[in-house]
């Protein structure tokens, strides 16, 4: 992806870099990006997906609850000479997201990579954004399944496919990925 990210010892970052690279590549493939797309990257962290997305899309909006992570994501975008990213600090686990400025924009694509608890609070807002495709990456298939039900049954999306990646060999944990379309 021709991107570099600096991080602190306590920052969250995928430790299995080989599989992380494959996961990011797969997410980009599933999004079917056009060079004119605006993409919303929820739970963006340091920019694991944001930076590669910015190499292929017209604009990427990253949203993350941790101010320090957002500052490092901005610094990474600057260091990688990416000028088509914007970042917002927002607790995506909040019950009331309706006043958030990033929810007032339009997006062709959305990527979510929430923590183990999932994206229950943000899912009800995604239907209003009318994105054509959503890729949901999760470290907990159970919360992905719960949120997929909401996307399909109340937000008007169709599940096109899902799979898992063995991001954590020799453990019971997997990284799951699903793609939805309208």
Language-model segments: which ranges?
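Rossmann-like S-adenosyl-L-methionine
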Residues: 1-182
């Amino acid at each position: 992806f021709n991107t570099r990210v600096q991080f602190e010892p306590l920052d969250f970052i995928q430790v299995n870099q080989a599989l992380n690279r494959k996961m990011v590549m797969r997410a980009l493939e599933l999004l079917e990006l056009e060079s004119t797309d605006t993409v919303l990257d929820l739970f963006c962290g340091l920019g694991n997906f944001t930076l590669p997305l910015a190499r292929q899309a017209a604009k990427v909006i990253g949203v993350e609850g941790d101010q320090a992570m957002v500052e490092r994501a901005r610094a990474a975008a600057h260091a990688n000479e990416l000028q088509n990213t914007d970042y917002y600090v927002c607790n995506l686990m909040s019950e009331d997201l309706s006043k958030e400025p990033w929810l007032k924009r339009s997006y062709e694509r959305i990527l979510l990579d929430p923590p183990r608890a999932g994206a229950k609070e943000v899912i009800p807002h995604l239907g209003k954004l009318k994105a054509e495709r959503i890729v949901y990456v999760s470290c907990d298939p159970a919360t992905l399944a719960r949120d997929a039900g909401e996307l399909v049954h109340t937000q008007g999306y169709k599940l096109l496919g899902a799979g898992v990646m063995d991001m954590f060999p020799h453990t019971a944990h997997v990284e799951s990925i699903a793609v939805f379309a309208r």
